């Protein structure tokens, strides 16, 4: 018998042994119980991702809170990452794009949010590059103007003016804009609103 025929015979015997073991439920080729656990974790992970995009850390934390086994969670996270259903770079880029445009958030506030979601520093920095400083200033100005429009009376004295100014500056501060820029834009927006009320 030549070498190739010998290899074929060994493979045939190994396949026969595997089929007999599998028929008796003794095969370790496919761990049915483990795959069942993975399917449950994967199902829950996909439900969470269907609600909204999430970072790797955020999804992992949520799955751990549901008391799934950590090694199964890690395998599912790995599968989702390899299939590009879970990607911190895409998540961070979309998070910044949407929150800057729709919520009027500063780059500093967005950086803090991404950090809380477990996105690493390099990925956060790359995502935040899409925010232009001029655009950020325009966003801050729009927030200041919107908040200043809520003033319905002309301040009667300096104390009233300062109170109104604090409200506008507070709106900017909550969105993470720098104090100096916030004060300038708040004063500009409040003064313009007072002029509108006078006319």
From Swiss-Prot:
<comment type="similarity">
    <text>Belongs to the RecX family.</text>
</comment>
<dbReference type="GO" id="GO:0006282">
    <property type="term" value="P:regulation of DNA repair"/>
</dbReference>
<dbReference type="InterPro" id="IPR053924">
    <property type="entry name" value="RecX_HTH_2nd"/>
</dbReference>
<dbReference type="Pfam" id="PF21982">
    <property type="entry name" value="RecX_HTH1"/>
</dbReference>
<dbReference type="GO" id="GO:0005737">
    <property type="term" value="C:cytoplasm"/>
</dbReference>
<protein>
    <recommendedName>
        <fullName>Regulatory protein RecX</fullName>
    </recommendedName>
</protein>
<keyword id="KW-0963">Cytoplasm</keyword>
<dbReference type="InterPro" id="IPR053926">
    <property type="entry name" value="RecX_HTH_1st"/>
</dbReference>
<dbReference type="InterPro" id="IPR036388">
    <property type="entry name" value="WH-like_DNA-bd_sf"/>
</dbReference>
<dbReference type="InterPro" id="IPR003783">
    <property type="entry name" value="Regulatory_RecX"/>
</dbReference>
<dbReference type="Pfam" id="PF02631">
    <property type="entry name" value="RecX_HTH2"/>
</dbReference>
<comment type="function">
    <text>Modulates RecA activity.</text>
</comment>
């Amino acid at each position: 018998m030549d070498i190739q025929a010998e290899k074929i015979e060994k493979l045939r015997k190994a396949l026969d042994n595997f089929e007999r073991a599998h028929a008796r439920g003794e095969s370790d080729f496919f761990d049915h119980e483990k795959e069942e656990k993975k399917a449950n974790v994967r199902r829950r992970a996909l439900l969470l991702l269907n609600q909204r995009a999430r970072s790797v850390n955020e999804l992992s934390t949520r799955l751990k809170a549901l008391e799934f086994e950590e090694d199964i969670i890690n395998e599912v996270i790995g599968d989702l990452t390899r299939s590009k259903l879970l990607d911190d770079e895409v998540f961070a880029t979309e998070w910044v794009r949407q929150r800057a445009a729709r919520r009027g958030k500063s780059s500093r506030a967005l950086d803090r949010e991404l950090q809380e979601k477990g996105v690493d520093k390099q990925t956060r920095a790359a995502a935040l590059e899409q925010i232009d400083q001029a655009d950020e200033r325009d966003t801050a100005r729009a927030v200041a103007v919107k908040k200043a429009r809520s003033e319905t009376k002309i301040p009667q004295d300096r104390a009233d003016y300062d109170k109104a100014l604090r409200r506008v500056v507070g709106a900017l501060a909550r969105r993470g804009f720098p104090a100096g820029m916030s004060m300038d834009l708040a004063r500009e927006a409040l003064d313009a609103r007072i002029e509108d009320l006078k006319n």
